[in-house]
Amino acid sequence: MQEKNFDKLKFFAAIIFIFLMMFELNNLMPLHRDDYDYSMIWKTGEHINSVADVFDSTYKHYFLHGGRFFTVFCLNLFLWLGKFYFDIANALMFTALILLIYFHAKRNFKSENDFKIFAALGLAAWLSFPHFGEVAIWKSGSTVYLWSAVPAAIFLLPYNFYLAKKFPNKKFFPPVIFLLGIFSGGGVENLGVTSTLLTAAISYRCYKKNILQSWIPAGFFGSLIGLIILLAAPGNFVRYDVQGEGKGFFSHIGNQIAGNAEMLLYILPVILILICSLKI
């Protein structure tokens, strides 16, 4: 009993350590580049001074620049609230993501707290996140990549638990996971496509095995709707007309393939470890 309590203490100490470390890193990072643009109502040059301005800027951004409505809203909101509050929120998001990855790995909320696994995940995130400062600390970058990953990880957690036979059916759950699916699918493009295809595959698998429950396709449709909202934003086409002038469709596809191949190099050690441990 005493040993279990000590394990819990170490586990929570690791959580607090990661939060404090990330808070200090965020505290040291000043506003930079795009942060100044997003501190203002989009394309107006006027500073955001109210919640109404936050909504107005997000709306203008959606129609003039891109479809990332959730992450842009969060960025505008916390830049208006102030750097201190942003630093706290960003540190919480990073800590939450490590916790969510931990629960995905354990596939159970009730299993023993494993300090070593949690600490290893924190270290792996530090070493393997591509361009760590840009995606986990810089405000305009972290809201796009880190903040979109958290709702996606929450959204996919019930699917992981259900496939592990550790998640019960809940009558109230379909509308909840439908909304989570919208935020997961509408966060950032590559993650939105991933969560949509993954939940589609899980829905099909459960249907074939005759274990399909109502919340499973509900999440898929939510993710699909979020992805459509993200990709069909008028701002995407406005930006493409400006930035994509003189470039063909296949040129953009080639850039994406090259970019994702680069990302694989960052996580290659993790992939090799997984293969060696026969987890994939």
Predicted features, each with a name:
Residues 152-172, 209-210:
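Membrane-interface transmembrane helices that cradle and orient dolichyl/undecaprenyl
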Residues 172-189, 195:
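Membrane-interface alpha helices of multi-pass inner-membrane proteins
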Residues 88-97, 142-155, 196, 264-269:
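Membrane-embedded alpha-helical segments of multi-pass membrane proteins
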Residues 117-160:
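Membrane-interface micro-motifs in multi-pass membrane enzymes
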Residues 91-116, 154:
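Transmembrane-helix motifs of polytopic, lipid-linked glycan transferases
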Residues 1-21:
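Start-transfer (signal-anchor) and selected internal transmembrane alpha helices
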